[in-house]
């Protein structure tokens, strides 16, 4: 009996995955005019610790940003934006401020730029996330663009360089999110596990999502 139930669950997860991808693709076409669903492997995993480009589902992003109160003065950056699913979601939700994405893989960044160029409030940067100044932004987001060692280096960069407080959204945080839990200036506002919504599985496995604030020493 248990084997039958396991088979049914497995088939339902597969059907859920196909349905969610179909829904996401339809949303992409409406907002971007192209699909953002295809995974792109990173050529920089071994050298720079950069993970591949995958698109977080719109339903997952609804939960990630649930309750967010964005303002016209907000400046948002998605670190490791890939083809721009987070950017597309923010457009759908009528984000009132400035939206930026930075992507290390030039080909992926160009794909994102191609559809995003028609929106005046979006800027897509093709480049290394370790080489820009984050004082231009007050909201940072990432969907696990780095392996744990590089995530730690990125956090240390923020702590060294930021001169004003930020809000930080971290999706797929289970590998390295704990690194910032007890560091000075960091405060967790919320954490949740995302796996199912509307009766459908959102991902292959449950994913952690946390929301933080960071206040630099000069602002405490």
Where are these regions (language model features)?
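S-adenosyl-L-methionine
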Residues: 1-71
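Conserved class I S-adenosyl-L-methionine
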Residues: 73-82
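Glycine-rich SAM-binding Motif I of class I
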Residues: 84-88
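Conserved S-adenosyl-L-methionine
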Residues: 92-98
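Conserved SAM/SAH-binding beta-strand->alpha-helix loop
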Residues: 105
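Conserved SAM-binding loop
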Residues: 112
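Conserved SAM-binding strand-loop segment of SAM-dependent methyltransferases
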Residues: 119-128
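C-terminal substrate-binding/active-site "lid" region of AdoMet-derived donor-dependent transferases
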Residues: 149-210
């Amino acid at each position: 009996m248990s084997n039958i139930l396991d088979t049914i669950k497995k088939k339902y997860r597969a059907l859920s995955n196909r349905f969610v991808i179909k829904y996401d693709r339809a949303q992409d076409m409406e907002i971007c005019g192209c699909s953002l669903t295809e995974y792109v492997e990173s050529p920089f995993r071994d050298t720079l610790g950069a993970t591949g480009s995958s698109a977080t589902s719109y339903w997952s992003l609804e939960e990630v940003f649930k309750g967010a109160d964005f303002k016209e003065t907000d400046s948002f950056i998605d670190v490791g934006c890939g083809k721009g699913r987070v950017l597309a979601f923010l457009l759908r939700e009528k984000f009132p401020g400035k939206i930026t994405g930075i992507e290390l893989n030039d080909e992926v960044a160009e794909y994102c730029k191609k559809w995003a160029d028609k929106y005046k409030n979006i800027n897509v940067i093709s480049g290394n996330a370790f080489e820009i100044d984050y004082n231009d932004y007050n909201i940072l987001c990432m969907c696990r663009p780095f392996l744990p060692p590089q995530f730690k280096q990125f956090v240390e960069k923020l702590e060294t360089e930021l001169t004003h407080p930020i809000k930080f959204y971290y999706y797929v945080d289970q590998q390295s999110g704990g690194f910032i839990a007890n560091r000075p200036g960091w405060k967790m506002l919320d954490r949740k596990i995302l796996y199912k919504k509307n009766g459908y599985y959102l991902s292959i496995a449950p994913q952690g999502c946390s929301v933080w604030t960071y206040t630099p020493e000069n602002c405490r």
